[in-house]
């Protein structure tokens, strides 16, 4: 009887040890992915997925997709891509903005949605890491209960730690020129991350990261400047009348977001403004506003991606830890998070002083973070202009406008573009390739 009992205990212990071993395997794990469900044949590029553990106990497991440059990975730049939100998966960048695959827009019939190759991938000339951050975003997860909420400034530190550990495991990329890139909300996190890496290069970390600069699209930069630019933008785009705009300017005095409750006139006119614009798609004012994910609607691709990323065969191919998350969501809108950077302008200043290049671009039909606000904060930095406002061209057609400043900052608009480059990926790719190769736009 005793032998049976000890045998049973031994089996249980062995099973427990096996489970511990399996869970440990996924700490700082990396897998080469040669096939992806939904894509026909082997992938025409090199994809690696994995987790990097962050923190003393590595309780935070940040998930990434790494794609090698299709040109010369030994020497080409290495780009870290952060999607905004906070809480939006980096799959948004990979499948909609600048990756080598995208969703095939077939009507969903209950089978696995298909993937197809793109022509506009930034991986044609750069290696790219698409990172799910903060913890809880995409496939990133925590092995213990989180007591400290992620924050803008905290993420800059975590991302720096991620990079040090990632490069420690991929030392062949440690000397490649390195850039941080992202759009939307990451306009607050990217400049802080650049400063954190720069500081680390001087203070703590060997070998240093070969940081060269950063890229930002329609970036949230300063809450007050960006939000107050929406009404002038709406007026310039003929969404509100001259009379309403003049009344708003007169009664609100340029402050349209933190209006004093006693300023009833201003509040009344803002209500009128909202009536004029609440049926406009803020991310791209030219497109129809879709409230349901129907096949003729732009956001249908988001629904297809949700079906794809929640498929068991896809998760297996990506080597997702089965215990990590339940349902994958593209954007975790209620993610616990402390928005502690109200303006990233001081970081831009410090990064310029440190000599880093930057490309700031704006889709010029975005009402969410309008180009007017981006131009305003860049102008307030008072850098001298070395290449004044001019069109930049693709095949003898105007693709947007650009201006370059003495602090190595280039500003560009993408004509007809929206809040993210998923609306104009071909044009954005050409703009990026020229800039990253050191050519004028």
UniProtKB/Swiss-Prot annotation:
S-S bonds: 88-331, 252-266, 290-297
Source species, domain of life: Eukaryota
Species the sequence originates in: Arabidopsis thaliana
Compartments, as annotated in UniProt: Secreted
Gene that produces this protein: SCPL2
Molecular function as annotated in GO: serine-type carboxypeptidase activity
One GO BP annotation of this record: proteolysis
Keywords: Carboxypeptidase, Disulfide bond, Glycoprotein, Hydrolase, Protease, Secreted, Signal
Cross-referenced InterPro entries: AB_hydrolase_fold (IPR029058), Peptidase_S10 (IPR001563)
Protein name: Serine carboxypeptidase-like 2
Function description: Probable carboxypeptidase.
Residue positions with a glycan: 109, 350, 382
Top-level EC class as recorded in UniProt: hydrolase
Entry's family note: Belongs to the peptidase S10 family.
Signal peptide: 1-29
Enzyme Commission no: 3.4.16.-
């Amino acid at each position: 009887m005793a032998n049976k009992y000890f045998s049973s205990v031994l089996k249980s212990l062995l099973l427990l040890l096996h489970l511990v071993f399996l869970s440990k395997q996924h700490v700082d794990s990396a897998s080469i992915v040669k096939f992806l469900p939904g894509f026909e044949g082997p992938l025409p590029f090199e994809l690696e997925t994995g987790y990097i553990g962050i923190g003393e106990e590595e309780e935070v497991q940040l998930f990434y997709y790494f794609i090698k440059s299709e040109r010369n990975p030994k020497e080409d730049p290495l780009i870290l891509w952060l999607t905004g939100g906070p809480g939006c998966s980096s799959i948004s960048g990979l499948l909609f903005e600048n990756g080598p695959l995208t969703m095939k827009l077939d009507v969903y019939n209950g089978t696995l949605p298909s993937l197809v190759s793109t022509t506009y991938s930034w991986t044609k000339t750069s290696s790219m890491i698409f990172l799910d951050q903060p913890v809880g975003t995409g496939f990133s997860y925590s092995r213990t209960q989180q007591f400290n909420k992620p924050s803008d400034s905290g993420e800059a530190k975590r991302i720096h730690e991620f990079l040090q550990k990632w490069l420690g495991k991929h030392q062949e990329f440690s000397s490649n020129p390195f850039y941080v890139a992202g759009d939307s909300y990451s306009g607050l996190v990217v400049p802080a991350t650049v400063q954190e890496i720069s500081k680390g290069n001087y203070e703590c970390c060997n070998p240093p990261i070969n940081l060269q600069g950063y890229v930002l699209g329609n970036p949230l930069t300063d809450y007050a400047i960006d939000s107050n630019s929406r009404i002038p933008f709406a007026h310039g785009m003929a969404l509100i009348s001259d009379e309403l705009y003049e009344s708003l300017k007169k009664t609100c005095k340029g402050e349209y977001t933190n209006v004093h409750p006693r300023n009833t006139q201003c509040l009344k006119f803002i209500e009128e403004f909202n009536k004029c614009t609440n049926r406009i798609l803020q991310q791209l004012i030219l497109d129809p506003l879709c409230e349901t994910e129907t096949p003729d609607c732009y956001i249908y691709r988001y629904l297809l991606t949700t079906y794809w990323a929640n498929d068991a065969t896809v998760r297996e191919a990506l080597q997702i830890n089965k215990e990590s998350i339940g349902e994958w969501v593209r954007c975790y809108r209620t993610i616990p998070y402390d928005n502690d950077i109200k303006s990233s302008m001081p970081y831009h200043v410090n990064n310029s002083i440190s000599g880093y290049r930057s490309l700031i671009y704006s889709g010029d039909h975005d009402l969410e973070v309008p180009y007017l606000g981006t131009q305003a904060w860049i102008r307030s930095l008072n850098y001298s202009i070395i290449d004044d406002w001019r069109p930049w061209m693709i095949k003898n057609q105007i693709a947007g406008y650009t201006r370059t400043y003495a602090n190595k900052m280039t500003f560009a608009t993408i004509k007809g573009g929206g809040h993210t480059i998923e609306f104009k990926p071909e044009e954005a790719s050409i703009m990026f390739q020229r800039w990253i190769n050191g050519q004028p736009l």
